[in-house]
Every structure is written in C-alpha cells, then in structure tokens.
C-alpha cells in the first residue's frame, strides 16, 4: 500500500512505547498517545479513508474496545455503517458468539445477528495486530452471518507474534500503518 512516508512516520512517532508493561520483558505500544495527538489521529483516519474509499465496503466491523476508536470514524469517513463486536453480554439485541484462545485460557466475542447480511462487504478494523486471535474470531462471526470479509486494517502490527501469518491464512488482505519488532 503506497502511503505518504512523512504521515506514516508521524503516526508511528506518536505511539509511545512503555517498557515492562503489563509485565516484565514486554514493550507495550500505547496507541492512546496517538489519540491524544489530534494531528496524528486525524492523519490515521484520513489515510485509511483514502485507501479504502473506492473498495466498495458496506460495513466496518470494529473489535472491542480500541477498534471502535478507529473503525467508527473510518466508517463515517466512508459514509457506511459501523458494527461493534463486543465481549459477552454487552450487546442488547440477539447475538451470536465465537470463542477464541488467549495466551492463558479463552474468551469470546459477540455480534448482533442482524448487523451483517449476505449483501455486506466488510472491512475489519482494530488498533493492534498481535497473535490474530481476536480478529480470527471476528472474521468467523462475520462469515457465519453471511458477510464477505477479505480485508483487515490495523494501526499497529507486531509481526513477531504471528498474527499476520494467521490472518493471511484466512484469506485476509492486511493493511498495517506501522510495525514494531518484538513483543
């Protein structure tokens, strides 16, 4: 994806790295510092809108919670609907759920059963791609409802954690605005 290197540099430099959080040996990439910088936040959304404007998406699906912060403004910029995927018990209408594995245990996500139809071409958006488990579960939910999903966008990717390979194996084309080495 050809994007303005100056803008991509602004985005990457706006993301603070917190050593040893949430545990020793981890370099935490704090996307909230990007949100605090209005210029960088707007540039992030503008780049994604520009890239996806002519792709024909009908819905954006964002994963709880930081996927909402990028998915919803992107949906507005594209003039299409936004669908949240949430933890169990947070959505008021009928839902379906999908479990997925975590490093220690498992979790699940839910989506409204009427939020996606067979006519929908869906873009999945999240702030960060690590192992890919959350997005894999999200893709399964969308496909179970009949939606077409072949694309996912992330502000940050941590390629060493294997998520990119996991999601490309699902047939997804990935857009990542910046990458960081390590965990």
Curated annotation (Swiss-Prot):
Keywords: Cytoplasm, Glycosyltransferase, Purine salvage, Transferase. One of its GO terms (biological process) is purine ribonucleoside salvage. InterPro entries: Ade_phspho_trans (IPR005764), PRibTrfase_dom (IPR000836), PRTase-like (IPR029057), UPRTase/APRTase (IPR050054). It is found in: Cytoplasm. It catalyses: AMP + diphosphate = 5-phospho-alpha-D-ribose 1-diphosphate + adenine. It comes from the Bacteria. GO terms for cellular component: cytoplasm. Gene3D superfamilies: 3.40.50.2020. Catalyzes a salvage reaction resulting in the formation of AMP, that is energically less costly than de novo synthesis. Homodimer. This is Adenine phosphoribosyltransferase.
């Amino acid at each position: 994806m050809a994007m303005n290197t100056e803008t991509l540099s602004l985005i990457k430099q706006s993301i603070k790295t917190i050593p040893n959080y949430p545990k020793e040996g981890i370099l935490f990439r704090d996307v909230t510092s990007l949100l605090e910088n209005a210029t960088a936040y707007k540039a992030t959304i503008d780049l994604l809108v520009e890239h996806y404007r002519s792709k024909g998406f009908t819905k954006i699906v964002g994963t709880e919670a930081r996927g909402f912060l990028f998915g919803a403004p992107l949906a507005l910029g594209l003039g299409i609907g936004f669908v949240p995927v949430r933890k169990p018990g947070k959505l008021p209408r009928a839902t379906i759920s999908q479990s997925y594995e975590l490093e220690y245990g498992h979790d699940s996500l839910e989506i409204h059963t009427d939020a996606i139809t067979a006519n929908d071409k869906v873009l999945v958006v999240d702030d960060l791609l690590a192992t890919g488990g959350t997005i894999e579960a999200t893709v399964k939910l969308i496909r179970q409802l009949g939606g077409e999903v072949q694309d996912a966008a992330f502000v940050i990717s941590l390629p060493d954690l294997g998520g990119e390979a996991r999601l490309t194996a699902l047939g997804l084309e990935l857009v990542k605005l910046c990458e960081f080495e390590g965990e």
